[in-house]
A protein has these predicted regions:
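Long, non-globular targeting/processing and low-complexity regions
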Residues: 1-154
Length: 160
């Protein structure tokens, strides 16, 4: 009987992972992160189920779900893009509207131009954009480090 239950669970597992594996590529680490995240979700779901054995399962689930939320924030680059919202809040929604301008060299090359470059306070906006961009990137790096430090600190306890 155990053999049949085990095979059934293995087939379910293959079906569950199949879409993720199908769309994956070997040249991008993001797919490895997605696979790891999927496994963390499965582990959390197991620990929330009636099949969980340990009494500390709810605490483990909470930590796993925290790691998953952090992964979403880090790998969707939520912090890296904060500067865009801040610039728009300070200077207006269309500040960072952009277009390509032909260089005139006849080789299909172009410059990236921003709406604010036509404004009187373009230098101020550019300086603020650089400052806020650096802050956003630094925050993104800290979040990335925090995520993996959190996982390293907790992962060996995430089992049933």
């Amino acid at each position: 009987m155990y053999w049949f239950r085990r095979k059934y669970r293995q087939i379910q597992r293959v079906i569950d992972f199949f879409p993720l594996i199908w769309k994956g590529f070997d040249f991008d680490y993001q797919y490895a992160v997605d696979l790891f995240k999927k496994q963390l979700e499965r582990t959390a779901n197991h620990l929330e189920s009636e099949r969980a054995i340990t009494l500390s399962a709810p605490i483990k689930v909470q930590k796993i779900r925290t790691a998953i939320r952090l992964m979403d924030k880090v790998y969707e680059e939520e912090y890296a893009h904060e500067y865009i919202d801040k610039i728009k809040e300070l200077y207006g929604e269309n500040t960072l509207d952009w277009w390509f301008e032909d260089t005139g060299k006849g080789n299909d090359s172009s410059y990236l131009r921003y709406e604010y470059e036509k404004w009187d306070n373009a230098d101020e906006i550019n300086e603020m954009k650089r400052k806020l961009f650096k802050e956003s990137i630094d925050k993104q790096k800290r979040a990335h480090k925090l995520l993996w430090d959190f996982i390293e600190h907790n992962i060996q306890r995430w089992w049933d």
